[in-house]
Amino acid sequence: MVIGAGVLGASVAERLAGAGLQVTLLEADQPGRGTSRWSFAWVNSNDKGPRPYHDLNHAGIRAWAELAPDLIGAAWYRPAGNLELATSDSGRAELAARVEHLASWGYPARLIDAAEAAELEPALLLPDPAATIAWFPGEAYLLTEALIERLVASLTSQGGTVLTGEQGRVTGLDTGPGDTPRVRTAAGAVIEADEVICCAGRWTPALAALAGAAGTVPLVTWDTPGSPAPALVVRVGPVGPEGPVRLIHTPQIALRPHSGGLLHLEAPDTPVDLHTPETELRRLAGQLLERARRTVRGLDQARVVAAQVCARPLPADEQSIVGRLPGAEWLYVAVTHSGVTLAAHLSRLIAAELAPGTPHAQLTAGAPDVQLTAGAPSAALAAYRPARFAGTAAHITGPATGR
């Protein structure tokens, strides 16, 4: 039983079904209609430390490239690369140092000049001729709605079941006779399962509390004024044929192409929360469109199509939380920032832990560098277990980077 049909939950459910298990996926709304729908969906390991967490994310990049051919990747996988610009003295120094650092770890990253940037992205309008420009050719973005549609289709084609709405909204979690995990839904059903995996994003702490394990999944509070978890997502269009084809980051804006001839826009300095008035959201959205017009070509006819506050799940120590919960060992959780980057790889690791007897090849198809032992704890996940928070007062150390 998998709770939550965002990109991580759908990936986990599809991997487990592919490993030969009978899987039910529960979703209170419709698959892919929550946080994943509004994600910037930037697949990267750019500025993610320490080294083991960088390596986990780098493996996530490779995992999507490996999975794409099996899931009609042309519909959702965009290995476009990322251009990042820095204009201040401190920004230029930081970007140059980061590129050198990442390259030393074997991550594709290099500094380029304005001429090469123009060749890579003809739509780019350089804000400053003295800008430092970095090129990250291995990075990508995903169209999450199309991706999740294909993950769910693959799940059901392998015998999986998807329950949505009241049938998929979890209202209780406990164990029955023989300590069998049970999930109660808003439709009144009580469903037994051998394993329950919670991939419910920011709702995971509340579900952990239902299972009697309150406080074991510390996320940054996302529903209070001033929280760093919410971000403003703006989509604009139509975009002309001369518009951008790659991810672009500047100090003022982050943007990428989106489906339907739109651009997806975000910015680090647009503080919003779930209490921000609609009039302020519209003002900020218009501001982001003007910034985008100063950054890329193709937006002469564009207008704001959507402005949405997206509340992201941010673990308190900014690292993934994956594994069985202290106090409710029958409940397995997987919650992380960078869920889009990590979903393909984390789901593979989780399937290896929860599918004993699964042939090794089924878990590592297309990934010969990944060493997994089905049914055994994953060494790659050892640092990310919920138990690390036991007896601590975990808290976030700074604003979310969005990376």
Segments and roles (model prediction):
Residues E14-R15, V43, A75-Y77, R202-G327:
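Active-site substrate-recognition segment that forms the wall
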Residues V2-I3, V190-W203, L207, S347:
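Short hydrophobic core segments
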Residues V296-R403:
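C-terminal catalytic lobe of FAD-dependent flavoproteins
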Residues F40-L120, Q252-A254:
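Dinucleotide-binding Rossmann-like beta1-alpha1 core, especially the glycine-rich loop
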Residues M1-T24:
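N-terminal Rossmann-like FAD-binding beta1-loop-alpha1 element of flavoenzymes
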Residues A74-E84, L111-S157, P268-D273, E329, ...:
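Helix-loop-beta segment of a Rossmann-like dinucleotide-binding subdomain
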Residues A134-A187, I191-D194, C199:
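Helical element adjacent to the flavin cofactor pocket in flavoenzyme catalytic cores
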Residues A17-R37:
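Glycine-rich FAD pyrophosphate-binding loop
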